[in-house]
Amino acid sequence: MNQEVMNLFNPQVPAQTFDSIRISIASPEKILSWSYGEIKKPETINYRTFKPERDGLFCARIFGPIKDYECLCGKYKRMKYKGIICEKCGVEVTLSRVRRERMGHIELAAPVAHIWFLKSLPSRIATLLDMTLKDIERVLYFENYIVTEPGLTSLKENQLLSEEEYMIAVDEFGEDQFTAMIGAEAIYEMLASMNLEKIAGDLRSEMAETTSDLKQKKLMKRLKIVENFMESGNRPEWMIMKVVPVIPPDLRPLVPLDGGRFATSDLNDLYRRVINRNNRLKRLIELRAPGIIIRNEKRMLQESVDALFDNGRRGRVITGANKRPLKSLSDMLKGKQGRFRQNLLGKRVDYSGRSVIVTGPELKLHQCGLPKKMALELFKPFIYARLDAKGYSSTVKQAKKLVEKEKPEVWDILDEVIREHPVLLNRAPTLHRLGIQAFEPILVEGKAIQLHPLVCTAFNADFDGDQMAVHVPLSLEAQLEARVLMMSTNNILHPANGAPIIVPSQDMVLGLYYLSIMNQNEPGEGMAFSDMGELHHALETKAVTLHAKIRGRYKTVDAEGNPVSKIYETTPGRMIIGELLPKNPNVPFETCNQEMTKKNISKMIDTVYRHCGQKDTVIFCDRIMQLGFSHACRAGISFGKDDMVIPDTKVKIVGDTEALVKEYEQQYNDGLITQGEKYNKVVDAWGKATEKVAEEMMARIKAVEFDDSGRQKPMNSIYMMSHSGARGSPNQMRQLGGMRGLMAKPSGEIIETPIISNFKEGLTVNEYFNSTHGARKGLADTALKTANSGYLTRRLVDVAQDCIVTHTDCGTDKGLTMTAIVDAGQVVASIGQRILGRTALDNIDNPVTGERIVDAGKMILEPDVVAIEKAGIQSVRIRSALTCEIQTGVCGVCYGRDLARGTPVNMGEAVGVIAAQSIGEPGTQLTMRTFHLGGTATVVDQSFLEASYEGTVQIKNRNMLRNSDGVLVAMGRNMAIQILDERGVERSSQRVAYGSKIFVDDGDKVKRGQRFAEWDPYTRPMMTEVEGTVHFEDVVDGISVLESTDESTGITKRQVIDWRSTPRGTDLKPAIVIKDKNGNIAKLARGGEARFMLSVDAILSVEPGQKVSQGDVLARSPLESAKTKDITGGLPRVAELFEARRPKDHAIIAEIDGTIRFGRDYKNKRRVMIEPAEDGVEPVEYLIPKGKPFHLQDGDYIEKGDYILDGNPAPHDILAIKGVEALASYLVNEIQEVYRLQGVVINDKHIEVIVRQMLQKVEITDAGDSTYIVGDNVDRIELEDVNDSLLAEGKKPAFGEPVLLGITKASLQTPSFISAASFQETTKVLTEAAVAGKTDNLQGLKENVIVGRLIPAGTGGTMTQIRRIATARDELILEERRKGTGAESATPMLADMANDPAAAE
């Protein structure tokens, strides 16, 4: 009541709307203009009266009254004196909440440097003055004097003088001949006297002259800061403070605790230090104290102000009474507990409850069970309102009483209130948007929330004690959004990959699988049924079993909706499932006439969703769930010990392997193989044995057996559970019935002795001990993994949060080329899977018939995909978010289908956040480790090529010879074998390694799976193209070649060793030369001599004087990969790719097409040049470390983008050399590979959205007529804007190359400083923004959440759109008025726009 009366007298001022927020450095005048008075005393409140002291930190005269409308001395009380200032105590009579708004200030007796501009690297003050930070600190903290005005003396400007040097200089030159100052005053003078325009001009001219890169960078940094100051209107001397602002007292409260003690904010202590020291300094100056004392006091003042702004940034941390560091102003903003992340982005919610969840199988998909007690509490305000409306109560107090007594009418009203009022259920951790969904509450007894079993997958919930939170959407708009967008029935598909997420699991799958099994010789086999009634009757009378082969009539409808029926060979169980299928011509009985494994059930639901729409799907899912549960119950599948079958051959397999291991031990003891080789072989042998046992076991379990009457025996229960996808994996079955196999040590190495027993036999003590390692490491890993995965998600969300669908179509002609991903002859991702739901960039035509499949700019749907794959189209150009040309966000056509809805994406969809969630959510399923697998197990290198399609061979860049054995050998380094289908369309194209044996030639026909090339994966050969006699050059025993004999075989081999390590060998160039019959060096086809340089470690395959013919091998270099290499896998690999880090030994990529030439070598680097093939291109030179295996020969032709040195390529190189498209396909494929290993499906477009955000910056290569400097990193959008205005004025535009930034860097460089500051390095971001006077236009989601507005996505996006239209309209009217056409013509215009928003656009 009181509040309402108050509102009559001071009506609520509507919150001002604003479009942007600007941050800059506060000038002393600005600080004084905020202030309501100076704080002169460090006192806070009087210990007897508890009233604030006058002029103290809580002074009521400055900050306002403590009680509403009451001055401090009590002379004026109540509203009627509003606005009067009491003459006794000087307090204005007003609301006490002004104590949260009014600021004060402290006048400093000596200027003080602001620590952010001093210490936040790079130091702004130091860069601006072009001095080192150390020197500036020396001056500021009173260690050295600085010469500001040398006069005619021999001193230099900005020279530092120690105390003694200063005294000597004064004696020598006299005090008035030069000026040297100390402390912040000195820096203030220097900053104030700077002429920024002149400095900027000098820097620009100096940059034009300088040649050194380092100098250029330094000048650029300084110029940037100078320009920032000029553009933002900040003055450099404002970085030195003469006035310190004091924040309002209610934001740093002093609270009395019981027992006469006080709890206080740390800021009060920090302010008190500043005031004390400041007052003492004033007094000392008045007393004319000696200079040294005053200097010490000034230094202490500087330190206390530093501590107030950023405690611990410089010097010791200032601690409070309890020895813990005091929280300074910076600490209030920083980190997870700071203002940004704790309070602005992490608000708590009212009207919420949480409880344990239990399963609710009788609920419908859109319902959840809400305990009555909980509902009563959550919906209280609604209940009070209804009680009042129905006349049960006249006041809130009465209503409260009724509810507390739980009167029967209250329950009736609760039912009314809850009807169709959705509530939100949330399960932490909310890793993706399906972690919060809306349901209609059904009141239940008890205290547990009931959850529908089908939504468990989305929430990742189970019923082993999980808890969930309930939230009530209050406003009508919120209820509407909950119902339309968040209802569980609207979230049938997974936003990450578009597959159904409402899929039966566990028991339901088992029940359906059991129902759909077909067995032989069951009772009733061969019967025929005309309708379901007959079938149910026969089942009841046991004339037929669920699994018998029968013929049944399935009734459905055709395209016109007329009933049709067809007879199928099926089982009664499958007929029962078919009964539930919606009647639709596109959902045939075949969808369920098969074994219903989890995969098939998912496909079935997908088919139903695509053809019958959402409503039918939801009903179908509910019925399928009921069916699954009831049949799981009836089947009563369980397993006993005997269901775990141990294969009989296990003993033999283990025995054979043990013998093999013994043999290896013997070889090692005889010194034939090294320790490492033995280890690898042993591990490999046991690995194979484990696999073999597992295979035998699976074969036993799967086997179909019959009983004496010839009826098929029931299937093995464990196999059923695993095969149906209900529970358990083949791996777990192997541990139960096969052998557990190899275990890892905590270090990640594999223990040589495996665990031979399985769980059925039981483990020996040793085996048990060995297996504890792995179990413990698994638990430790899980904890680390969760944290890492969460951090990755946070970085992804931060980088992509401002990526929103803002326009329908950007009309770009750029896009990506999609092809199928083939790995080792297996198609991992077909072209159809990759292009489904994307927009075609060009028309897609059938290459044979020429008929149009998809028009350019249209979305590729399921039928189109089938047509494209049938037509054998190999590559399709599609639009992608990566190449979208909209300035902010992306356009709908480039993005394509909204995966969670199966329709084109809506305007205002926050696709960035969805992408981040889709990539981050499966993060916890990825592994954490770097694999150190021993042994041949990891020689993943392929050693052959197989045809993945049938067709005709065509060889690109054909360069082959027949060697002396008559086998074709590839001599070219960029040969490719293509397979064409009967219509001449290329189905696949594979590069062939140099030296491969080729079994096909142009025009040959190949069958699928036929091997057409193979090579040795462990060595790379060096072959001759000419015939002749072998001669060695510089091959000197003991210096460049070492001979060794293999003891087991007695064969000697000669291997090249590093000849440069000995003084005698420095000038040798070991090579093999081929001479013709006249004794001259033979000539190669491409014009060089037949001289083959040998690399270190090459093994010679020929003897001097030996005759060789074309294609014969002269020497072999062992390949690195034959050794086991560590593969970074899982989460660390994904993070490495998104952070765009350079790999340790990264590949070197050729930048141009051309010929390899060797230059003069350096001490431990080889010089390799590429002579360009085209004219007018500069040759490129690379330095390659000598120890690295290098396989190219002098004169080899190499194409742009080929690897000169093998390894993982650095993404930056791919971008620079091959461009954005190649980079995108590299990153997408590498990231997908990690997820694919874990069986996680993520749509490519999500990764593309993130990569788009990583490519927002451009490095200027040609500044044109702009103000940019070459080497500047600018925003892509900003560059486009600048160029548009340059072109409009007829000037030369600036050009830039795209730059790839890692996600952390990209987040910190977003145009929005609010978003960047709330991410990481808060002080640094804010310092930078303040110096540049940045403006935040509030375009992303995060900034808007922080300032407390609707986000510009979804419903908020529409509001933004409407506001934009309104502003445009206002501007139009103002323009009219300005032109002087008067208001008359503008008024009708206004009316038009109000009726037709499109006109306003």
Swiss-Prot record:
Function: DNA-dependent RNA polymerase catalyzes the transcription of DNA into RNA using the four ribonucleoside triphosphates as substrates.
Binding, Mg(2+): D462, D464, D466
GO biological process: DNA-templated transcription
Lineage start: Bacteria, Pseudomonadati, Pseudomonadota, Alphaproteobacteria, Hyphomicrobiales
Chain intervals for the UniProt region annotation (Disordered): 1377-1401
Listed EC numbers: 2.7.7.6
UniProt cross-references to Gene3D superfamilies, sorted A to Z: 1.10.132.30, 1.10.150.390, 1.10.1790.20, 1.10.40.90, 2.40.40.20, 2.40.50.100, RNA polymerase II, clamp domain, RNA polymerase Rpb1, domain 3
List of residues binding Zn(2+) 2: C810, C884, C891, C894
Pfam families: RNA_pol_Rpb1_1 (PF04997), RNA_pol_Rpb1_2 (PF00623), RNA_pol_Rpb1_3 (PF04983), RNA_pol_Rpb1_4 (PF05000), RNA_pol_Rpb1_5 (PF04998)
Record PANTHER family: DNA-DIRECTED RNA POLYMERASE, DNA-DIRECTED RNA POLYMERASE SUBUNIT BETA
Protein name: DNA-directed RNA polymerase subunit beta'
UniProt-annotated binding residues for Zn(2+) 1: C71, C73, C86, C89
Enzyme class: transferase
InterPro entries named among the record's database cross-references: DNA-dir_RpoC_beta_prime, DNA-dir_RpoC_beta_prime_bact, RNA_pol_asu, RNA_pol_N, RNA_pol_Rpb1_1, RNA_pol_Rpb1_3, RNA_pol_Rpb1_3_sf, RNA_pol_Rpb1_4
Record text on subunit structure and interactions: The RNAP catalytic core consists of 2 alpha, 1 beta, 1 beta' and 1 omega subunit. When a sigma factor is associated with the core the holoenzyme is formed, which can initiate transcription.
Organism of provenance: Rhizobium meliloti (strain 1021) (Ensifer meliloti)
Domain of life: Bacteria
Keyword Protease on entry: no
CC cofactor note: Binds 1 Mg(2+) ion per subunit. Binds 2 Zn(2+) ions per subunit.
HAMAP family with a match to the protein in the record: RNApol_bact_RpoC
Cofactor(s) demanded: Mg(2+); Zn(2+)
GO CC aspect terms: DNA-directed RNA polymerase complex
Keywords noted in UniProt: DNA-directed RNA polymerase, Magnesium, Metal-binding, Nucleotidyltransferase, Transcription, Transferase, Zinc
Family in the record: Belongs to the RNA polymerase beta' chain family.
GO MF annotation list: DNA binding; DNA-directed RNA polymerase activity; magnesium ion binding; zinc ion binding
Keyword Nucleotide-binding included in the entry's annotation: no
